[in-house]
Structures are given as C-alpha cells and as structure tokens.
Amino acid sequence: MNDLLSRAMRLLSQRDHSESELRRKLASQPFSAKGHWGKQTGRSDNEPVADIDPKVIEQVIAYCYQHNWLDDARFATSYINSRSRKGYGAQRIRSELMQKGVDKELIQAAFEISEINWCLLAKEVAQRKFSEILPIEWKEKVKVQRYLLYRGFFQEEIQSIYNDFVE
C-alpha cells in the first residue's frame, strides 16, 4: 500500500485529479525508475504485470479523501476556471469533466458557483482569433460561429455576440 500511496501523493502533488482519474492511474502499470509508463525494470515484455488489488486502491482513495488531498468538487471548480481561462466554453468543459468521471451534480454545482460571463468570454475568444472587429458578412460569420461551437460555446452565447454588436 505504501508504494501506491506514495504514487497517489506524487500524482496529487502535481495537480488535482478526479477520483475516477486517480483510480485509473493507480490501477495502471507503475512508473519505472526512468519514469516511462508501462515499463518495469527487470521485466521482459512477455511477462504479465501483477494486478493491483482493488481493495488497496480503495484504501488509498479513502486515505486521500480523509486528508483532503482528493476532492471532486474542488477539482471541478479548478478545472472550469482553468479551461475557461484558455478560452473554452461551458459545453466543452462539461463534456471533459464527464469524461474524467466527475458526477453530474458536482459539475452543475461547480458551474453555478463559477462567476464566468460566458457571453463575454465567447466574444473575447472570437476577437482574439478573428480580430477586434467581428465580421458581418454571412460567410465570415459562419466561420466564427463554427469556431466558437468547436470551443464549446452554446448557440445563444454566440448569437449574443452579434446581438450586442448590432446594438
């Protein structure tokens, strides 16, 4: 358990992880001395890797929760803030959090406490990518809309950019 616990501490010291993400990383093959995934020193590629007991992983996860090293709500909040600063919209961030195994209710709660103006963020992202003056021609507008949809913004947020622009 000590090896697994030290591995969990090392992972969590680098950045926050969701419980599901940490569980997956702990169950995977351990680091070698050189730091490469899936390669252990003194083992040939044909030898099977010993499976890690799920009970031990549960104990490590519980220990991390007890010491407040692991918290899905904190992870979701920091992830939303981090990804929004990089110019991603709520829809994409929500999808990424679900892929990382965060509970829907925790995601919703994290979005409710975040004080991000998604319409303003969409406008800033569009201006950063396409220029300060947003296009008014249909063909160019479609490019902006497609880009913002790809970045995870909702159609209403994209439309608000042009509604504010017209007024």
Curated annotation (Swiss-Prot):
- Its family? Belongs to the RecX family.
Record flagged with keyword Cytoplasm: yes
State the UniProt keywords alphabetically.
Cytoplasm
Segment Disordered: which positions? Answer: 19-49
Coiled-coil regions listed in the entry: none
Q: Which Gene3D superfamilies match?
A: Winged helix-like DNA-binding domain superfamily/Winged helix DNA-binding domain
Where in or outside the cell it occurs: the entry states: Cytoplasm
* Domain of life, per lineage: Bacteria
Origin species: Yersinia enterocolitica serotype O:8 / biotype 1B (strain NCTC 13174 / 8081)
Q: What is its main location?
A: cytoplasm
The coding gene here is recX
Q: What does this protein do?
A: Modulates RecA activity.
**Lineage start:** Bacteria, Pseudomonadati, Pseudomonadota, Gammaproteobacteria, Enterobacterales
Record-level GO cellular component terms: cytoplasm
Keyword Nucleotidyltransferase tagged: no
Q: Name one GO biological process term.
A: regulation of DNA repair
Q: What InterPro entries would the database entry show?
A: RecX_HTH_1st, RecX_HTH_2nd, RecX_HTH_3rd, Regulatory_RecX, WH-like_DNA-bd_sf
Q: What protein name applies here? A: Regulatory protein RecX
